[in-house]
Design a protein with these regions (language model features):
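Bacterial N-terminal signal peptides that target proteins for export
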Residues: 1-15
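Short hydrophobic transmembrane-like helices used for membrane targeting/insertion
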Residues: 18-22
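N-terminal signal peptide c-region/cleavage motif recognized by signal peptidases
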Residues: 24-26
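N-terminal, motif-rich segments that launch catalysis or mediate targeting to/interaction with membranes
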Residues: 28-178, 185-333
Length: 333
């Protein structure tokens, strides 16, 4: 792909223009809507040289023809560039169950226990990867990294002297996705119990939540905070512009971009998981399942207050992720 001409001023106005030409997409979940929002926020924060370098690298991606060729309906160069960066943010989900898939890269299961007694009993027996340092010889082919390690690897390889342009492009796509992942609290934490969740609740995937039409799970609830849009549609772009118009959120983003360590981002998400995601009602439901691990945990009906807090947390985390992603991609040389 030819390096694009990015000689235009960064800002939020360009987000609004795309509304006129992008049609609504099919249903999906957070990892489309949320990740594309992170990418759009990041794009608004990048300077022109960074945009040029990032788009140039994505033009060298080994799957550029399949995943990074904008739809013909997008004629405006600026809109095509936005589509490409938002596509980079979902590429790692598009290649799931292929040889490029790295399932463990998306999360880390920092433990949450029902009590101090449970922590003392269970922690020595945990079999989870909580490492923050890369194993010796780690590469983009290494399967069993956690999200902290994966981010560290991609940042290292992004400017490694022996890295090919194709490898660096893959690093960009992973970073566009993983920076979003690590800001979703359920990607940082799992609840561990002595009987039912000895191996963890998979970031809330095994905790049922009462839904309007059918029950979902805790992880899905948080994944769904930004709706079910598979592609870049007008509503999604309007929401990105609204996030960037919120002074409090922008202030939070500016504070966040000063802290660029993946371990710090996980620690923030873990605190949110502990303080917001795993509410007293959810912990009580998990605890009730310990008496009979074979019996289904009762679905938790979340309160209006919980929903409001979740919405506020999700909005802030997406903005923080976008600001940080812009700073990380500024490392591209």
């Amino acid at each position: 792909m030819r390096r694009p001409n990015c000689s235009w001023r960064p800002g939020t106005a360009c987000l609004c223009a795309i509304i006129l030409v992008v049609t609504p997409g099919m249903a999906s979940a957070w990892w489309d809507s949320g990740h594309r929002l992170v990418a759009l926020v990041a794009w608004s924060r990048m300077d022109v040289p960074t945009r040029t370098r990032v788009l140039g690298l994505l033009g060298e991606h080994p799957q550029v023809e399949k995943y990074f060729t904008p739809p013909a309906r997008l004629q405006d160069g600026r809109l095509r560039h936005q589509w490409i960066i938002s596509q980079a943010a979902v590429w790692s989900d598009l290649v799931r169950k292929s040889d490029r898939d790295r399932p463990t890269w998306h999360y880390i299961n920092r433990p949450l226990f029902l009590s101090e007694k449970a922590r003392r009993s269970l922690q020595p027996r945990l079999r989870v990867n909580l490492a923050t340092r890369l194993p010796k010889g780690a590469s983009l082919a290494t399967q069993d990294l956690n999200v902290i390690q994966a981010i560290s690897l991609c940042r290292q390889r992004l400017n490694a002297r022996d890295a090919t342009e194709a490898e660096r492009a893959v690093c960009v796509t992973w970073l566009c996705h993983l920076v979003g992942d690590v800001h979703q609290p359920c990607h940082s934490t799992a609840s561990f119990t002595a009987r039912r969740f000895l191996r963890g609740d998979r970031g809330g995937n095994d905790v049922p939540i009462r839904g309007d039409k059918k029950d979902i799970n805790l992880h899905m609830y948080w994944d769904g905070q930004f709706g079910q849009t598979r592609t870049l549609d007008g509503d999604l772009v309007r929401r990105a512009a609204a996030l960037l118009a919120d002074r409090k959120l922008v202030a939070a983003g500016r504070r966040a971009e000063k802290r660029l360590q993946g371990e710090t981002w996980v620690a923030e998400s873990h605190r949110l998981a502990r303080d917001v995601v795993y509410s007293s009602a959810i912990l009580a439901a998990i605890g009730s399942g310990e008496s009979d691990p074979e019996k289904a945990i009762p679905a938790v009906e979340l309160s209006g207050d919980y929903a409001r807090r979740a919405r506020a947390v999700a909005r802030q985390r997406v903005v923080e992720a976008g600001f940080r992603l812009a700073r990380v991609l500024a490392e591209v040389r």
